[in-house]
């Protein structure tokens, strides 16, 4: 694991000691080299002997999420260049350092062997994200968004810390390898049900579960582009990863406790998709669509079947890349029009035809057509939920329909129609932006050729 953590940490001195005009180029190139060098981790031996140590381990559940995290660092750096072009060199280097620190804590979260280390790193991601939102956000509301993000996350996480200390005292270990052998004798009591709730609530806030999601649209809308990318692509997946780990350990309890959360997720999935239909703000629409997709993942994790686990992990990876790409496209519009309102960006297809092609591809993938991995993930989840209860086909089908409607609405509002006057003299699309979109799209297309490497533990 150190072969990914140490080179990532060494990007910090690289950023500070490199010459001012080479800061972006050097950090982007070296981070891209790290992401390419870490792709071999996707090949997991059956006994997991290559990636096991007392502190860190990788299995087929954490590896795809880890690779997604590492892959996103150069993309965040590429996307942020225009946003910081007017800032001082010190600001640029501080921004890059903050992103790298966030990256390191994310890598260590996905690779942690011990639950207390997972908790510490899970909370450590909060500080750099807060700094990115509140220091480099665009509007004054960023402080409000930062406080929402902070309090929701901390209020959800405090019971988890108390519960982990209780488990440590009771069982004597928090090691993820040991716990399956120690938690076999959990009884269905009120106290153990509360233990399950406190363990999962921190991750449900991070997902977020419908009802605990109010921090997400605010944080997404006010964050700069790198903040939006890392929030959508990885921080939401931290919640899914934590829930997958915890619910497998507390397995008999999950089957007693899952019903209200399943109902809430089914309801929230349709509600947030419907909210998307009446959004005027581009980033807010993409943020609410993230809540809708993550509700599907919560349903899959709660159902506790091999197919649903495979669907949850596949959809998390697919959504991470797709939503990150949509945020990059929304940001490219914002950099030209200086507004997130969709109707003001109408008619951009005639001015930026190549960017319109990227919009079309991203919108299509968001609608989950064959042969994308989005479809594979959604099919696995819908099939599993249908086998649990036939009635789930109605909210699931309605959600698929509304998702198609709001995605087409977003696409047509921003790209088609008569060009507004203020958009006549905008900048053309840059090679940097086209490269950024291609690097989002390439993994999605390649994974659709061989999806089994991201299907997780149960494949």
Swiss-Prot record:
One of its GO terms (molecular function) is ubiquinone binding. Its EC number is 7.1.1.2. Pfam families: Oxidored_q5_N, Proton_antipo_M. One of its GO terms (biological process) is electron transport coupled proton transport. InterPro entries: NADH4_N (IPR000260), NADH_Q_OxRdtase_chainM/4 (IPR010227), NADH_UbQ_OxRdtase (IPR003918), ND/Mrp_TM (IPR001750). It is found in: Mitochondrion inner membrane. Keywords: Electron transport, Membrane, Mitochondrion, Mitochondrion inner membrane, NAD, Respiratory chain, Translocase, Transmembrane, Transmembrane helix, Transport, Ubiquinone. The chain crosses the membrane at residues 21-43, 60-80, 99-119, 147-167, 195-215, 224-244, 257-277, 284-303, 308-330, 351-371, 375-395, 436-456. GO terms for cellular component: mitochondrial inner membrane. It catalyses: a ubiquinone + NADH + 5 H(+)(in) = a ubiquinol + NAD(+) + 4 H(+)(out). Its main location: mitochondrion. It is a multi-pass membrane protein. The keyword Transcription regulation does not apply. Core subunit of the mitochondrial membrane respiratory chain NADH dehydrogenase (Complex I) which catalyzes electron transfer from NADH through the respiratory chain, using ubiquinone as an electron acceptor. Essential for the catalytic activity and assembly of complex I. Core subunit of respiratory chain NADH dehydrogenase (Complex I) which is composed of 45 different subunits. PANTHER family: NADH-UBIQUINONE OXIDOREDUCTASE CHAIN 4. Belongs to the complex I subunit 4 family. This is NADH-ubiquinone oxidoreductase chain 4. It comes from Elephas maximus (Indian elephant).
